[in-house]
Amino acid sequence: VLHADETPVSMLKPGNGKTHRAYLWAYATGAFENTKVVVYDFCESRSGEHARRFLGDWRGSLTCDDFSGYKALIASGVTEVGCLAHARRKFFDLHAANQSQIAEFALQQFARVYDIEREVKELSAEQRQASRQQHTQPVLDALHRWMLLQRQKVPEGSASAKALDYSLRRWEALTRFTGDGQLPVDNNWIENQIRPIAIGRNNWLFAGSLRAGQRAAAVMSLIQSARMNGHDPYAYLRDVMARLPMQRASQIGELLPPRWQPA
């Protein structure tokens, strides 16, 4: 199981001193996986070819939003896992705009799903799947029937129709988590790993070149992966830098954040 997301980063154009929008792509192992790693990939654009190049022939479950850049991966055999938080956000915005009763009811049902998720978070994958099948699936089945009924009533092109269509169009992917205890309910896990990058943009403003962005992405991958594994990033990097010159190439994996032990 992998999570994927991307965020814009300004990159300096060579020669003219101006910047253009590049992207930092992020890929993280699932929140329920034993190995916790995030890898950032700095690229010149948001083209889906970057995700295809990075993931290569990997074929697993990819948690992502509705961005078209992931569609070719899904068409090639990657299993799409939707983000229920994105679906919920459509109704949240709808309710904030006009106190929609449709949005209010949908939000109540999403809240029920998330209440169950909080209860099963620490369970085994098998127990989580059983609980989702018993408790979550009936809620989602009823919500789906209700959405289909409401869609027949609302005007085409209305804000309500757009919120409903987002969920209905992606329903299979959005509810895939109920059949597998290893799958997440949403993509918030990767968004949390991108948040430090978004905050950092206010301080470092732009990448000086493509190579500079790629080097920064490599270092940030180590730092954030260290955090994910409960390590102090400074202590981790200091220890690794001291040991790296003497580390055998065959044992270099021992210095990666999931396997690192302080000397």
Language model features by range: what are they?
Residues 1-263:
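Catalytic center-proximal scaffold of phosphoryl-transfer enzymes
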